[in-house]
């Protein structure tokens, strides 16, 4: 069976407030994640909300990586969607553990666009 894409949905709970408010750090961490996944960034957009929170999107040649933070809820949502390859979610979680402070992670792996 063939699919058009692979979608990894990552929810991080119990995140560090100060780290989530450090948008420069989050942006660099996201770019490093894209490089670690061996993807090519073709566009990017970032927005800082007030009084807090941040959203960012990297358009990669394979699709996209997005992040949304809710410091007031100690939560981060990350989506990685690609049309070219599946990623090892364990390696991605290991990368996130090295670069972010959080207490709990939930992951959903979704195969998208089934082709008969």
UniProtKB/Swiss-Prot annotation:
Active site residues per record: 63, 68, 83
Assigned EC number: 4.1.1.50
Modification after translation, per record: Is synthesized initially as an inactive proenzyme. Formation of the active enzyme involves a self-maturation process in which the active site pyruvoyl group is generated from an internal serine residue via an autocatalytic post-translational modification. Two non-identical subunits are generated from the proenzyme in this reaction, and the pyruvate is formed at the N-terminus of the alpha chain, which is derived from the carboxyl end of the proenzyme.
Pfam families: AdoMet_dc
Required co-factors: pyruvate
Site (Cleavage (non-hydrolytic)): 62-63
Pathway: Amine and polyamine biosynthesis; S-adenosylmethioninamine biosynthesis; S-adenosylmethioninamine from S-adenosyl-L-methionine: step 1/1
Keywords: Autocatalytic cleavage, Decarboxylase, Lyase, Polyamine biosynthesis, Pyruvate, S-adenosyl-L-methionine, Schiff base, Spermidine biosynthesis, Zymogen
Reactions catalysed: S-adenosyl-L-methionine + H(+) = S-adenosyl 3-(methylsulfanyl)propylamine + CO2
GO (cellular component) term, any one: cytosol
Textual note on the cofactor: Binds 1 pyruvoyl group covalently per subunit.
MF terms in GO: adenosylmethionine decarboxylase activity
Record's keyword annotation contains Lyase: yes
Single GO BP term: spermidine biosynthetic process
Protein family per UniProt: Belongs to the prokaryotic AdoMetDC family. Type 1 subfamily.
Descriptive protein name: S-adenosylmethionine decarboxylase proenzyme
Organism of derivation: Clostridium botulinum (strain Langeland / NCTC 10281 / Type F)
This protein's encoding gene: speH
């Amino acid at each position: 069976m063939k699919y058009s894409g692979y979608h990894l949905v990552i929810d991080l709970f119990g995140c560090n407030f100060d780290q989530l408010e450090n948008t420069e750090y989050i942006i660099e961490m996201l770019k490093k994640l894209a490089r670690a996944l061996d993807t090519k960034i073709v566009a990017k957009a970032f927005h800082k909300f007030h009084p807090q929170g941040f959203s960012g999107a990297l358009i990669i040649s394979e699709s996209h990586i997005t992040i949304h933070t809710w410091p007031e809820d100690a939560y981060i949502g990350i989506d990685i969607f690609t049309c070219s390859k599946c990623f090892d979610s364990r390696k991605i979680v290991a990368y996130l553990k090295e670069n972010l402070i959080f207490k709990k992670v939930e992951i959903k792996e979704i195969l998208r666009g089934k082709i008969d």
